[in-house]
Amino acid sequence: MDALYSHFSQVLEQQRKANTRLVVAFSGGVDSRVLLELAHRYAQEHLLPCCAVHVHHGLSHNADQWVQSCAAWCQEKNIPLTVERVQLDLTQGNSIEEEARNARYQALRAHINADDLLLTGQHADDQVETFLLALKRGSGPKGLSSMAQQMPFSQGRLIRPLLDVRRQEIERCAHAIGLHWVEDESNQDTRYDRNFLRQQILPALSERWPSFAASVQRSATLCAEQEALLDELLLPVFEQLFGEDQSLAITLLSQQSELARFKLLRMWLAKLGHPMPTRHQLSLIWQQVALSQADANPILQLSQGQVRRFNQRLYLVADNQDLSAWHAPITLNTPLALPDGLGTIELTVSRGFGQIALPEQSEALWISFNPEGLSAHPAERGHSRKLKKLFQEYQVPSWLRRRTPILMYHQQVVAVAGLFVDRQFIGQDCELFWRK
């Protein structure tokens, strides 16, 4: 255990700060069980706070018992434990493994503050499995880099201190100090790809080539280094392409070679937190979205959003609710919560300083998101026009036109938030504030 602790300490020394807090991702399995022991010892020696987070997926009938076991083990060490219960969304077409992993990291993300270190228990055998799964998918250097030992995560960093340690060494240490841990029965189910590799493939590879795991780790490191070098070389180009609104300039992108263009698209999606696209998806982004006809409104659906085009720039747009049917009355000086994360809107009385004249029946004011069939006459325009045309003139992207609040009086447009006030309602009684 001392040798393992020495290795653990060396990894953490590179990342520890004066106000660092250790957060252990604690499933209760043997890897995280040993990790908890190491983190507790390190925290005591360096006078650091240490806590644990257990994610309850609800996939096993033993899950509640695992929570009790984890709570007992943390209590023995006086380590605070938080239990996060998650619901898996299996409608997206992802495997149960992938959805569980995504839900787990999303739950952990909420617990990581500035300078925190999230410690996870992946080891060298996990790295081999990840590498082989990436190879099966036909991944390039990015995917074959597998898992990084440390990386930014939420407001802190994610550290995998055991990534260079074989599973058998972790189990040997656990037995040596008399630890108990939970066993996930699904780990024996070879219908899952990772379990198939673990149970049937890796033992044969390791028996034939004992240094196979170390060789895979070396290859993964080389792939990561090549990918990092490519990022470094293309960063000046990427910074020219990338806009303040997180869009990408199509004209400048078209001046790059196809290889550079695809890499820059990957860098863009990675910066926005989107999973790595396939080569086919990259080709579709370029051919069907970037190069579509000037009057087209192209859309390419990805796993976590849509790629859209506007004013010769590419945008990654989140999948949003259809708000066409949403409407609500608005009361003076009372913030109105808007749906789908669009913030609040408030009509504030400010006599003599406002932009809108109050109609006689202010109780007939309401908010809508549906511009269909509506017209308005902005004060600075010569005549009335359909809202569809006005949105185009005011350079509002098509996907935001049904997400921009419209202030209505009966069936008349009073104002469009952030754009204009209809000339019929120009005055100084009140102002419309949209806080996104």
Curated annotation (Swiss-Prot):
Transmembrane segments: none
Gene Ontology terms describing biological process: tRNA modification
Gene3D superfamilies: 1.20.59.20, HUPs (3.40.50.620)
InterPro entries: Lysidine-tRNA-synth_C, Rossmann-like_a/b/a_fold, TilS/TtcA_N, tRNA_Ile_lys_synt, tRNA_Ile_lys_synt_N, tRNA_Ile_lys_synt_subst-bd
Domain notes: The N-terminal region contains the highly conserved SGGXDS motif, predicted to be a P-loop motif involved in ATP binding.
Source organism of the structure: Vibrio vulnificus (strain CMCP6)
GO molecular function: ATP binding; tRNA(Ile)-lysidine synthase activity
PANTHER family (alphabetical): TRNA(ILE)-LYSIDINE SYNTHASE-RELATED
Assigned EC number: 6.3.4.19
Keywords from the UniProt entry: ATP-binding, Cytoplasm, Ligase, Nucleotide-binding, tRNA processing
Catalytic activity, reaction form: cytidine(34) in tRNA(Ile2) + L-lysine + ATP = lysidine(34) in tRNA(Ile2) + AMP + diphosphate + H(+)
Class in the EC hierarchy, top level: ligase
Protein name: tRNA(Ile)-lysidine synthase
One GO CC term, this protein: cytoplasm
Role according to the record: Ligates lysine onto the cytidine present at position 34 of the AUA codon-specific tRNA(Ile) that contains the anticodon CAU, in an ATP-dependent manner. Cytidine is converted to lysidine, thus changing the amino acid specificity of the tRNA from methionine to isoleucine.
Subcellular location: Cytoplasm
Binding site for ATP: S27, G28, G29, V30, D31, S32
CDD domains: TilS_N (cd01992)
Stated family: Belongs to the tRNA(Ile)-lysidine synthase family.
